[in-house]
Structures are given as structure tokens and as C-alpha cells.
């Protein structure tokens, strides 16, 4: 789930923290990728006539097709990916996982109704909602990555937290995921849409953690409390408090404890036994493997091994697999090239550019404040409605 409404809040109040780029602009970068998020995307998106790709026995192969060709695309663009797989979820995530299970049950019932009615569009919609990444999917992806010569890391707990640890240790440049909580874990850079298909023509969105804090005018601890207030995977949020109200409260009171002492609890309903302190601990000190002990190596692909793994029962086209393997080898041989900016120290922004950017941010904030003033007579419930 990530953090509810965080990307929009940053876009509104800290626009300078976001930069859109083409994938080729990340040439020479090492990037830690949330593997489970990728596999889910591939199972959803890589389809033929609305259905997942599968073997004659019905075993899905969409995740392998997506992993193989999207990884080749990254390497073709000079990016060195390392995939990070989820470990055991923290106990505090049990509530969120239970909610997901309930939504799956609802989707299964809706799918049955759609199937009985013969509604193809609804059938496809609810089939997509029932997609989940299994341990078998992950194990197959790991085997594929080994054969491709691409490193992966098994996180002891949350993949986003392990990605953030790799970034903070300087092992990689950024975390690539669609979950915004990578920023809450302190990833210096977050990349969204990096593993999207080329056909979607989505520019990569790069979020800079330092600029997020600067634009929102928060410390790292205050930012974590903001994310908890907005809604995270580890605990419920206070009913009636949406993103804009959450940041107003954090800026006024600076932490959740002081907010709880000052808000009207008849208007804002605090969850019973609200475990926000434990959620905060999970963001501040997540369970991760020490990045200094992780050795990342990109090696030559095993062409024959790839053919054996992907062709045959999985029915991949052998010629295409061998062509893919040759592309992998070519990218491996060209990895000696480095980014030009690694030789130079970055110059500070010019005063004119900095001033113009600051004016833009102030205009956005002023516009948001004007809207708030016009709607201040509305009910707290309306202001606290969660974005979809």
C-alpha cells in the first residue's frame, strides 16, 4: 500500500523534490528494485488476450517474461539492477494483510457473479484483483536472475527497507518501487515507473529525500510521523485526518504525542490501542541485513542455462531467448563505461534558477492555503477524506 496520498502531497508542496527523466539518463547507475512489486506488475500487465501467459499445464509465466525482458531493457540502458525480495512481514503488518485477504474474498465473490453473467470486462477486472505474488513466483524469478548474471538480495523483512539501507550505504543510487514508504525508510532517492513497459511511455519519476524534507519543512522524524498520520501498512490512521490536515498538525505540534494531546477526539477518532509508536520504530530501525556485508556482482549470463530454463515446458521461443542472452552479454562487456558526472563535482544551482524554483514552490503553497481558507467552513470529515 505504501503511504496514502504522499506522492500528491509532495507534488503539491515540495515540487522541487520531483524530477522526471528518461530511462537512459540513469546510465551507469546501480538501482535496488523492489522485486515483489515488479513481479506483481508483470503478472498483471504481461498478458495475451486478457489472460496471463502460461504453460500448457496452466503454470503462469508472465512474471518470467516480464522479468527477463524488462531486466534486459534496464541493462541495455546502462542500468545495473539488483532485485530485493521480501522476507517475513513484521507482526505489525498483520492487520493490513488481513484487510487484503478480505478484499480478495470480496473479489472472488464478484468474479463468480461476473462469470455467471458472462461479463468479460468484469471477469478480467476481478481476475487482476486476485493476482498475488507467491513464493514459487519469487523462487523462479531468483533462478532466472542467477542465469542472467543479475544479483538479488533476500531481505529479512521488508524489501523497501532493505533497498533504502543499500542506498544509504552507497551500494546503489536509488530504490525503484511504486511504494512511497521507501522514502519513509529514508531512501535518498526513489524511482517510480522505472520497470514500466516502454509502450506505456511513462517518464521515470525521481524523488529526492532531502528535497522532500526541505520542501515540506520537516525533519526526518517529523516526516515519519506525517507518514503514519497519513496512513501506512503498520497501523490504522486517525479518522478525519487526510494528507493536508496531517501536515498542518505535524507543522503545528511537531510529533504525534503532542497532536494527541491537542486534537478534538470527538471530531477525530483515534484508533483503539493505536500502536503508532511501534510503527515509528519499524521505520526508524527496520530489520535489514547490514549493507556492508552484501557483495553485489553482475556476471556473464548462462545462455544454455537460460534456454533450458525458459524453453521446453515454459515454451519461450529459443531464438528470442538466445538473442536476449546475447544482449545481456553485450551489456556486461560495456559495463566498464562510467557516468561522466562521476569525474566532476556538481556545481550549485545558479541564484536565478534557485530563486525561480523557490518562487514556484511558494506559489503552489500560497494557492493551497487560499483553497483551504475558502473551504474552512466545511466539516472535518470532508477535509479528512482519503484520496482514492
From Swiss-Prot:
Role:
Structure-specific nuclease with 5'-flap endonuclease and 5'-3' exonuclease activities involved in DNA replication and repair. During DNA replication, cleaves the 5'-overhanging flap structure that is generated by displacement synthesis when DNA polymerase encounters the 5'-end of a downstream Okazaki fragment. It enters the flap from the 5'-end and then tracks to cleave the flap base, leaving a nick for ligation. Also involved in the long patch base excision repair (LP-BER) pathway, by cleaving within the apurinic/apyrimidinic (AP) site-terminated flap.
Which Enzyme Commission number(s) are on file for it? Answer: 3.1.-.-
Q: Which Gene3D superfamilies match?
A: 5' to 3' exonuclease, C-terminal subdomain, 5'-nuclease
UniProt-annotated binding residues for DNA: 47, 70, 158, 231, 233
One Gene Ontology cellular component annotation held by this UniProt entry: mitochondrion
Stretch list, region Disordered: 351-388
Interaction with PCNA: region residues: 336-344
Q: Report the protein name in the record.
A: Flap endonuclease 1
The lineage's top-level taxon is: Eukaryota
Q: How is the cofactor bound?
A: Binds 2 magnesium ions per subunit. They probably participate in the reaction catalyzed by the enzyme. May bind an additional third magnesium ion after substrate binding.
Listed binding positions for Mg(2+) 1 are 34, 86, 158, 160
Amino acid at each position: 500500500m505504501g503511504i496514502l496520498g504522499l506522492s500528491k502531497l509532495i507534488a503539491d508542496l515540495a515540487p522541487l523534490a520531483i524530477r522526471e527523466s528518461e530511462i537512459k539518463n540513469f546510465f551507469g547507475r546501480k538501482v535496488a528494485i523492489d522485486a515483489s512489486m515488479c513481479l506483481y506488475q508483470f503478472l498483471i500487465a504481461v498478458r495475451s488476450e486478457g489472460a496471463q501467459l502460461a504453460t500448457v499445464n496452466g503454470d503462469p509465466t508472465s512474471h518470467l517474461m516480464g522479468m527477463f525482458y524488462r531486466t534486459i531493457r534496464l541493462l541495455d540502458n546502462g542500468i545495473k539492477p539488483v532485485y530485493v525480495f521480501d522476507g517475513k512481514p513484521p507482526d505489525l503488518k498483520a492487520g493490513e494483510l488481513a484487510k487484503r485477504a478480505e478484499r480478495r474474498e470480496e473479489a472472488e465473490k464478484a468474479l463468480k457473479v461476473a462469470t455467471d453473467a458472462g461479463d468479460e470486462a468484469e471477469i478480467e477486472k476481478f481476475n487482476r484483483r486476485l493476482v498475488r505474488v507467491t513464493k514459487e513466483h519469487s523462487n523462479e524469478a531468483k533462478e532466472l536472475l542467477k542465469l542472467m548474471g543479475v544479483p538479488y538480495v533476500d531481505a529479512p523483512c521488508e524489501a523497501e527497507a532493505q533497498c533504502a539501507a543499500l542506498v544509504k550505504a552507497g551500494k546503489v543510487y536509488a530504490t525503484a518501487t511504486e511504494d512511497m514508504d521507501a522514502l519513509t525508510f529514508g531512501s535518498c532517492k526513489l524511482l517510480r515507473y522505472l520497470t514500466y513497459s516502454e509502450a506505456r511511455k511513462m517518464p521515470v519519476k525521481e524523488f529526492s529525500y532531502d528535497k522532500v524534507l526541505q520542501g515540506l519543512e520537516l525533519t526526518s522524524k517529523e516526516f515519519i510521523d506525517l507518514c503514519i498520520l497519513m496512513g501506512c501498512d503498520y497501523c490504522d490512521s486517525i479518522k478525519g485526518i487526510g494528507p493536508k490536515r496531517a501536515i498542518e498538525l505535524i507543522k503545528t505540534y511537531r510529533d504525534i504525542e503532542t497532536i494527541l494531546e491537542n486534537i478534538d477526539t470527538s471530531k477525530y477518532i483515534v484508533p483503539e490501542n493505536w500502536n503508532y509508536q511501534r510503527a515509528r520504530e519499524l521505520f526508524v530501525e527496520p530489520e535489514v541485513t547490514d549493507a556492508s556485508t552484501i557483495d553485489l556482482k553482475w556476471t556473464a549470463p548462462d545462455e544454455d542455462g537460460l534456454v533450458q530454463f525458459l524453453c521446453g515446458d515454459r515454451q519461450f521461443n529459443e531464438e528470442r531467448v538466445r538473442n536476449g542472452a546475447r544482449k545481456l552479454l553485450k551489456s556486461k562487456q560495456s559495463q566498464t563505461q562510467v557516468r561522466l558526472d562521476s569525474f566532476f563535482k556538481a556545481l550549485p544551482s545558479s541564484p536565478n534558477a534557485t530563486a525561480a524554483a523557490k518562487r514556484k514552490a511558494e506559489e503552489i503553497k500560497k494557492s493551497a492555503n487560499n483553497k483551504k481558507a475558502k473551504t474552512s467552513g466545511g466539516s472535518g470529515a470532508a477535509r479528512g477524506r482519503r484520496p482514492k
